[in-house]
């Protein structure tokens, strides 16, 4: 099946592109802007830097007067992507990311025992999450709160998702939106130890500030949580890709 699904293309003097003959180039696909550059698990190493196709090609053609036309084309995510970094801020600050607060026990009462700022949407033990607590002699029992101020880039219906090893939920402006806390089903993520993802949708307005809080409770030495959000599509993605291709000299 894998062999039959492959298509072999012959390069008949198409590549490499002649920059002197191209004024517009189309970059189409969901991995053009944010590509998957490494694997998961033991292959999930964090590189010193990343260059994704849109960024790399744009930098290469920066001085060539070549216009880059980008279109996402479709969604291929198994899990929802992270909140846009440029639209998410530590509450009360201009810094992008989440304020992460750690509490002892199963509640969020009192002052947090530790705070840090993190970015991304996947946090687990094998990448160093909560490392300072996992080395303790006593089996850790912690509650963690991820908080960010989110300013939606467009108005519409946003879909949020969360799953974890342990209990998790998402709140928007203090109101619970996604509940993977009161009941759970077995999932596939994190070596099959996590619960299945749960999702819910909410209408948000462009430019308005929303407090997004992800609450997480775990017991043991293998914390793992992932959460994401898909914003509404401003256009029909497939139609947009077709228009971009027609308007370009190379795709």
Task: List each model region and its residues.
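Cofactor-pocket helix-loop regions in the catalytic cores of large enzyme subunits
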Residues: 1-18
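Extracytoplasmic/secreted envelope proteins and their assembly/folding machinery
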Residues: 2-6, 51-54, 238, 248
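Loop/turn elements at helix/coil->beta-strand transitions in domains of secreted/extracellular proteins
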Residues: 4, 22-24, 63-68, 209, ...
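Conserved hydrophobic/aromatic pocket- or pore-lining residues that grip, position, or stack substrates
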Residues: 5, 25, 57, 103
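Acidic/polar loop patches that form or flank catalytic/metal-binding clefts of enzymes
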Residues: 15-16, 63-73, 213-214, 222-225
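Core structural elements
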Residues: 22-32
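Glycine- and acidic-residue-enriched helix-capping/strand-helix junction motifs
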Residues: 33-60
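Acidic/polar, compositionally biased interaction segments
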Residues: 75-249
């Amino acid at each position: 099946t894998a062999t039959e699904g492959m298509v072999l293309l012959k390069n008949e003097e198409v590549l490499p592109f002649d920059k002197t003959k191209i004024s517009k180039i189309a970059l189409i696909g969901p991995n053009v802007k944010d590509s998957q550059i490494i694997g998961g698990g033991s292959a999930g190493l964090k590189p010193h830097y990343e260059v994704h196709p849109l960024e790399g090609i744009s930098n290469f053609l920066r001085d060539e007067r070549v216009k880059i036309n980008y279109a996402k084309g479709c969604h291929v995510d198994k899990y929802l992507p992270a909140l846009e970094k440029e639209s998410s801020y530590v509450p009360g600050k201009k810094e992008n990311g989440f304020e992460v607060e750690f509490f002892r026990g199963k509640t969020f009462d009192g002052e947090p025992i530790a705070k840090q700022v993190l970015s991304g949407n996947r946090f687990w033990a094998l990448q160093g999450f909560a490392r300072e607590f996992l080395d303790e002699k006593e089996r850790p029992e912690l509650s963690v709160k991820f908080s960010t101020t989110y300013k939606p880039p467009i108005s519409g219906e946003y879909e949020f998702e969360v799953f974890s090893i342990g209990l998790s939920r998402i709140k928007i402006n203090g109101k619970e939106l996604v509940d993977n806390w009161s009941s759970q089903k077995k999932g596939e993520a994190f070596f099959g130890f996590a619960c299945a993802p749960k999702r819910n949708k909410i209408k948000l307005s462009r430019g308005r500030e929303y407090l997004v809080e992800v609450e997480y409770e775990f017991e043991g030495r293998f914390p793992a949580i992932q959460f994401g959000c898909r914003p509404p599509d401003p256009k029909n993605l497939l139609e947009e890709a077709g228009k971009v291709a027609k308007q370009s000299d190379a795709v």
